[in-house]
Amino acid sequence: MAKFKCKVCGYVHEGDKAPEKCPVCQAPASEFEDIVEGGDAAPKKKGLDTNSNTYTIVYAAIMVVIVAFLLAFVSSSLKDKQDANVKLDYKKQILNSLDLRGLSNEEAETKYSEVVKDEKEVEEGYKIFTCDLNGETKYIFTVKGMGLWGPISGFIALNADKQTIYGVYFNHEGETAGLGAEIKDSKAWQDNFKGKKLYKGDDKSAIVLGVKKKVEIPESEVDAVTGATLTSDGVDLMLKDGLAKYNDFLKQ
């Protein structure tokens, strides 16, 4: 015959099961525990303590591993598409400098293949693209620099004379919206570069194309973006330093 002990008052009951109520303190059957031989209450079977620190740490670690695995899987699955999108965006920026804007993805791929005939890297990050635009040769040069809040870059398209600007396109990663962002978002401002000259006359000792708050050489300089002096200064320096890397080619 089994023995059951009331955890409230200590009353011991003998029988097949615990009484519905303790006759001494009226505690319910749930307050009784088995007594094993020797008089001690049967130890409770230990389960998983979901309130313990160990459980919390282990659970969190498992979730971190699962989430990391899922993110890695998704990233790996999308990598090819992401790389393709980056390359396509780069091609569109090149076409923008030729004033071929607003093209769909398919149109951009087709037009790029038609127009760009050769690509040459003179230094890491600095490339020359030789293009055939409606039977006319154009050269596109990549440049890069720093704006107020982050990196800026550009594509400078020249006519076959390697002196006259055909078109430009600038990009940025984080310039002030409405001010510094004008270098990318304002086609009207970019159009100011059309027809400008890299050099002052026949003197090819230095690039004079630039962006100035007060224009002194109208044949080669463009008005700075109002309210974005530091960004404009960054573009000016980028043009002079960046295009100087192509001096050997430009002087040919």
Question: Model-found features: residue ranges?
Answer:
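Catalytic cores of transferase enzymes with a strong primary signal for eukaryotic protein kinases
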Residues: 2, 14
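Residues immediately within or flanking Cys/His clusters that coordinate Zn2+
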Residues: 3, 19
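Cys/His/Pro-rich metal-binding microdomains
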Residues: 7, 23
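Cys/His-coordinated zinc-binding microdomains
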Residues: 10, 26
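Short, non-ligating residues that shape and space the ligands of small metal-coordination modules
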Residues: 15-16, 29-34
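A generic "binding-loop/recognition-motif" signal
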Residues: 18, 28, 175
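Intrinsically disordered, low-complexity Ser/Thr-rich linker and spacer segments
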Residues: 34-45
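Flexible, solvent-exposed loop/hinge segments and secondary-structure transition points
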Residues: 43-252
